[in-house]
Amino acid sequence: MPREIITLQLGQCGNQIGFEFWKQLCAEHGISPEGIVEEFATEGTDRKDVFFYQADDEHYIPRAVLLDLEPRVIHSILNSPYAKLYNPENIYLSEHGGGAGNNWASGFSQGEKIHEDIFDIIDREADGSDSLEGFVLCHSIAGGTGSGLGSYLLERLNDRYPKKLVQTYSVFPYQDEMSDVVVQPYNSLLTLKRLTQNADCVVVLDNTALNRIATDRLHIQNPSFSQINQLVSTIMSASTTTLRYPGYMNNDLIGLIASLIPTPRLHFLMTGYTPLTTDQSVASVRKTTVLDVMRRLLQPKNVMVSTGRDRQTNHCYIAILNIIQGEVDPTQVHKSLQRIRERKLANFIPWGPASIQVALSRKSPYLPSAHRVSGLMMANHTSISSLFESSCQQFDKLRKRDAFLEQFRKEDMFKDNFDEMDRSREVVQELIDEYHAATQPDYISWGTQEQ
């Protein structure tokens, strides 16, 4: 029984990474840019209907909803070879097309105004599914639409579909240099509050780390957005392979999430991918084995979140799920896991079992691949809190001076006061504290002493 997933793409970033994701899915399932199954794609072992549905004329159409408050990116999608792939009724552009001006409050309050139009689309998609499992939301947390409208949708989805899972792919902004959005720290924290309270699972895509990987590992001098988005679509498609090429384990979203998230608030995941090479000559020198892939996945340089090394806290893994694609001998998996445990290659939480799981998945039969085995790691690691800490520091710098708050005052929500910002700051601080507490053996009783 396929459990369908509806993808919601918001704002410039969400629609760009969503576009790459669908491009990748079409390639993997042998679907042409018009949505027609290619002649060669006759192996019926993949599950297309988790992410696509078939129209009356046998076209495959993505279960995707494209939302933006300004038209540029969606117009570029509609002028691309993939224009006919999407259902035009599922594309929503706001009437005035002015965007949210990189302002969370504007995105959020526009969400309230266009709420009915958006939920008409989402409800129609949900009704068209046999047994909907949940929603996947692609957005960035720094701008206006992805963060503001994204936050609004997260809250409403919880009210409207309380039993459905909500997973997000959230792009975090650059940390080291000045961003082009001055109010980015405000936008980020306000969105983080919703990601903490209203999402079941957040896959963190950190621009800083993605850039580093593109530069160091793929040897691209100045990586462009589209090159980084390709990295992101690789992660997104690899993290859904077990849903699309089902095996006996992890073949639905709850199975993936349940193995990674033992306690509800600590649901921010980082990813790692290997082998990453664009250089064909280098690719052929090594024989990729399961152990090789799993060991590489644990190396910080392959992890797509840049976290600071914190001397005070012993950061550790809460859980790991490795999705290994390719020709794999299952006995090798067991040996590799044993080797990792014996050599203590990964440092796990003191209050629970060392949960490192492996899901084996087939590769797409239609895509040539340079490597026999490739792997994606999805890890729940306490050091992700350093990402939130740096967001908080940037927020505090601005909030202390009440800098750049004029645009926020224009919206009803912040007309009289900025309580919502300070509340968000508290929620994120509690999240950081809980991640720190999770490194201690007494975490199980954490939070019970205070009451």
From Swiss-Prot:
Modified residues (Phosphoserine): 131
Post-translational modification remark: Phosphorylation at Ser-131 by BRSK1 regulates centrosome duplication, possibly by mediating relocation of gamma-tubulin and its associated proteins from the cytoplasm to the centrosome.
Any single GO BP term: microtubule nucleation
Stored Gene3D superfamilies: Helix hairpin bin (1.10.287.600), Tubulin/FtsZ, C-terminal domain (3.30.1330.20), Tubulin/FtsZ, GTPase domain (3.40.50.1440)
Gene Ontology cellular component annotations, sorted alphabetically: centrosome; cytoplasm; cytoplasmic microtubule; cytosol; gamma-tubulin ring complex; microtubule; microtubule cytoskeleton; nucleus
Single GO MF annotation: GTP binding
Binding site for GTP: 142-148
Alphabetized PROSITE patterns for the sequence: TUBULIN
Location(s), subcellular: Cytoplasm, Cytoskeleton, Microtubule organizing center, Centrosome
Keywords: Cytoplasm, Cytoskeleton, GTP-binding, Microtubule, Nucleotide-binding, Phosphoprotein
UniProt entry tagged with the keyword Phosphoprotein: yes
Keyword Coiled coil: no
Similarity comment: Belongs to the tubulin family.
Function: Tubulin is the major constituent of microtubules, protein filaments consisting of alpha- and beta-tubulin heterodimers. Gamma-tubulin is a key component of the gamma-tubulin ring complex (gTuRC) which mediates microtubule nucleation. The gTuRC regulates the minus-end nucleation of alpha-beta tubulin heterodimers that grow into microtubule protafilaments, a critical step in centrosome duplication and spindle formation.
Assembly and binders: Component of the gamma-tubulin ring complex (gTuRC) consisting of TUBGCP2, TUBGCP3, TUBGCP4, TUBGCP5 and TUBGCP6 and gamma-tubulin TUBG1 or TUBG2. TUBGCP2, TUBGCP3, TUBGCP4, TUBGCP5 and TUBGCP6 assemble in a 5:5:2:1:1 stoichiometry; each is associated with a gamma-tubulin, thereby arranging 14 gamma-tubulins in a helical manner. Gamma-tubulin at the first position is blocked by TUBGCP3 at the last position, allowing 13 protafilaments to grow into a microtubule. Interacts with alpha-beta tubulin heterodimers; the interaction allows microtubules to nucleate from the gTuRC.
Protein name according to UniProt: Tubulin gamma-2 chain
Lineage: Eukaryota, Metazoa, Chordata, Craniata, Vertebrata
